[in-house]
Every structure is written in structure tokens, then in C-alpha cells.
Amino acid sequence: VSAPLPLIVRELGGAGAPLVVLHGLLGSSRNWQSAGVALAERGHRVLAPDLRNHGSSPWGDDCSYAALAADVVAMLDRLALGPVHLVGHSMGGKAAMRLVMDRPDLVARLTVVDIAPRAYSDRVRVEFAAMNALDLSAVKSRKDAEEKLAAQVSEWGMRQFILTNLGQDAEGRWRWTVNREALTNSLPEILGNPLAAGEVWDGPTRFLRGGKSNYIRDEDFATIRAHFPRADVVTLPESGHNPHFEARAGFVEATLA
């Protein structure tokens, strides 16, 4: 694994036992502002890093889950945090699974949000194709960028999510704030299984799934329990893939229960 990168960390407030949130692909700590504050109000010190190649954190070519986890381990060591309640959504959930296998001493409790320890085939490729096809030099405004994305990304909410990664440099030129090239090249790895057969963490574990999402299927339960024998699976029926947005109150309850 490449040397760990120093992650930018957003402190979302609170005092008490530390709870660390790992965001998903094309996300950042900003996505967790509201849910993080809600968790902090329940008596936790909540921290959310920008993972490598995302948000304001440094870029690196290695997007393996071992590398993502090692960055977070270095952050926990630097801040003298641990054992923590580790919460990971989607890609961040896979990074969290990898971390508990590599450094079980740093995690008191694991919450994995709407992702299973397996490979996924078809996800997000359309979004990356749309980002890669967008000629930033021809973009006149954020609205213009959204209209250009609409040709490939039909869902308004997904276009808005992609556009959270579009910024302007000092000269006012549009640029991606994510390392689009490294993430595109690493999609097979990001979509892959973060765990190897036989890896087990027997700490307290909860998998949260959105009732309207198909990321965690009933047939994934056996695989989940093979790696995490103490895991339970809680479904938030009103939510899709992003329960921290779509069902925040239920998400906070299920995360802390």
C-alpha cells in the first residue's frame, strides 16, 4: 500500500465517545453535515474526513480499500482516537469493513450503510462516463453543466450530487474537485469486494439498508454474517441508497440504538 495521505477532517461537534463517518463515492464530509450534527446532539463527538481523491483531501493514484483504510487509520492515530464507532456509507462502508479487519483495535462498533461485502457490477459507470464526457472549458455556468450532464444522467438528484464535485479555480475555470482520472481508472476496484474469504471481525456490527434500495439483498445476509458474526441488518423502509438524507431520524436512531 502507498504511504497514507493526510486527510482533511470535518469536526461536526459534540462531546463524548468518538463517532467517525466515512462518505461514499463522489461524496465528501459535506454530505454528512446535517446527519453528523444530529448524531453529535445524541452525545457523540462526530468527525467526518474527506477520503483520498475526494473533497479537500489529497489525491493519490491508489484507490484500493487497503489505501483508503490506511489513510483513516493514520488519521485516528494522529488524533489519538480509538476505539471509535465507525460508520461508513457505500464506498465508505467498504473502507470501514477493510479497516476493522486491518486494525480491529481501533473500532468499538461498526455501522455499514447500504452496502454489502461483495462486488457490484453496473453501478456509477454512467455517472463517470458523463463526467468524463463533459468539456469543462466549454461550461459557462453550473446550470450549463447540469444541462450538459442531463444527456447521460436522467435523474435530477444524481446530477445535483455530481455537481457538488464541480468547482472553480482561482482564475474562474471550472474543474472537478475529485480526482476523476484516478477514480475512473479504479472503478473495478472500488466496485469490488473489500474483503477476502475467511476474514472475520466479531465486534458489534449493524448493516443499515434502504427499503427502496437494492444494494443489500436478502441473499447477502449469509455473506455478511460469515465476515461479521454479530451483525444484524436493519431496514429503513422509506429510504433509498442515502438514508442519512432520505430518512434522517430513522437513520440516527438505527445507528445509535
What are these regions, as identified by a protein language model?
Residues 97-102, 106-141:
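Flexible "cap/lid" loop of the alpha/beta hydrolase fold
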Residues 122, 137-192:
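Conserved alpha/beta-hydrolase catalytic His-Asp/Glu region
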Residues 88-92, 96:
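Gly/Ala-rich beta-loop-alpha elbow adjacent to hydrolase catalytic centers
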Residues 236-252:
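Catalytic histidine-centered segment of alpha/beta-hydrolase-like enzymes
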Residues 1-20, 41-44, 81-83, 171, ...:
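Alpha/beta-hydrolase fold catalytic core
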Residues 67-84:
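Conserved acidic catalytic loop of the alpha/beta-hydrolase fold
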Residues 8-58, 206:
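Conserved HGGG/HGGXW glycine-rich cap/lid loop of the alpha/beta-hydrolase fold
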Residues 170-227, 232-235:
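Conserved serine/cysteine hydrolase catalytic core
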